[in-house]
Curated annotation (Swiss-Prot):
Coiled coil: none annotated. It comes from Caenorhabditis elegans. Residues 29-76 form the F-box domain. This is Uncharacterized F-box protein T20B12.4. Pfam families: F-box, FBA_2. InterPro entries: F-box-assoc_dom_typ2, F-box_dom, She-1-like. It comes from the Eukaryota.
Length: 386
């Protein structure tokens, strides 16, 4: 029990752990003898179906289930999805709400909302593992599908006390003014697709300052004109993110770029200069880069001058000798990064560590590929694509 209580992140526990807990408390046949606090602690780690079954056992159990936050991994709200389980053969306006109870098991449900005249039609798909188990169809009279879908999603946020770990919002006009969301203090992964900076700001302000993963997108038709401004990029959630990808123009300055803490990131450059990228590489070479750095993808057609970017930096070109010595690595790298100039830059602090710089007409990629390894007391470099 102590081991479960001390988990830094809540999760759905394994069958073995539930069995151990059941033995510890004397099995569920002794459930009625447990005090309320102990019952609540057990409830926190039950899956959704088990909670539903328990809630119909008695009025007191129903009350406990209703006041105990449910564990939810991710909530997703998507605008105008296609291929909606044969709901229609044509595209139509809809909202899909997905609730995932586990990151990897596929245990989830999906609810599709769409408008038919004055009524909202709903299809509810439940999944256990990776198989669809059941489908329900409903009609809500005299209401709006957009409003009802958001209310439904936010109701599930409330059920888990807004403590889910991941959120994915892909909506053009999320009703922020009428929203009940105030804080997402435990959310560590956030994906937002929006057409304005105000929506990005509204969601980021509700998240912790240090995120594991952040992704910002806009409509595909806007990606070459929509720009995330420099002042917005000072958000702590951006500066401290472990991984982030912005699928639109992003006006990072060189200073902001050099102070990022992300191990993996990518964005469309607006203000980044060759000097800024040169300084970024030199920081890594001299041991001042981000610890355990993995990948930086910089999309720009203006920053393809390898001479300016690599000045003052020692490197090894991928010549014939290198390609023969590291044939497996080079082949794997070339599958992901096609035609373009590729060079290897070695750390001055540890020569067994290196990064690959890849230049293409519209991308500069900086990727940690060489890693120190020791086998049979012999130290060597192992090259691999992260």
């Amino acid at each position: 029990m102590e081991e479960i209580e001390n988990q830094s992140k809540r999760r759905i526990v394994s069958k073995k752990e539930i069995n151990e807990l059941s033995i510890y408390i004397g099995g569920f046949k002794y459930w009625k003898f447990l005090n309320e606090d102990c019952k609540i602690e057990v409830l926190k780690y039950l899956d959704y179906c088990s909670r539903c079954q328990l809630s119909i056992c008695s009025k007191s159990d129903h009350k406990l289930v209703s006041i105990t936050p449910l564990y939810v991994y991710e909530i997703e709200i998507s605008d105008n999805e296609r291929s909606l389980h044969s709901t229609s053969t044509k595209d139509f306006e809809n909202i899909v709400v997905r609730v995932k109870f586990s990151q990897f098991s596929g245990y989830r449900f999906e609810v599709v909302f769409w408008q038919v005249e004055e009524d909202v039609h709903i299809r509810w798909f439940k999944y256990f593992g990776f198989k669809q188990k059941s489908v329900r169809s409903l009609i809500w009279k005299s209401c709006n599908y957009y409003e009802q879908s958001v209310k439904f999603a936010e109701k599930w946020m409330k059920v888990c006390n807004y403590e889910f770990q991941s959120i994915n919002v892909d909506m053009n006009k999320y009703p922020m003014k009428s929203s009940t969301v105030r804080s997402l203090a435990r959310c560590k992964t956030i994906r937002i697709n929006a057409t304005d900076i105000a929506t990005y700001s509204w969601w980021l302000e509700k998240c912790p300052e240090k995120l594991d993963y952040l992704e910002l997108k806009t409509l595909y038709s806007n990606k070459d004109t929509f720009t995330i401004p420099t002042d917005f990029l000072d958000f702590s959630q951006i500066k401290n993110a472990g991984t982030f990808y912005f699928w639109c123009r992003s006006a990072f300055t060189d200073e902001q770029f050099l102070n990022l803490k992300a191990k993996k990131f990518g964005f469309h450059c607006v203000n980044i200069t060759a000097n800024g990228i040169n300084d970024f590489i030199k920081k890594w070479v001299n041991g001042h880069g981000v610890n355990e750095f993995q990948k930086a993808l910089l999309w720009s057609a203006k920053l393809n001058n390898s001479f300016m970017i690599m000045r003052g930096i020692e490197f090894r070109s991928w010549d014939q000798t290198f390609r023969e010595q590291e044939a497996e690595f080079c082949s794997a790298f070339n599958e992901e990064f096609l035609d373009g100039e590729k060079i290897q830059v070695y750390s001055r602090i540890d020569p067994y560590e290196s990064i690959t710089i890849y230049f293409s007409p519209d991308t500069i990629s900086i990727i940690a590929t060489g890693h120190r390894m020791t086998r049979n007391k012999k130290t060597f470099t192992r090259y691999q694509v992260p």
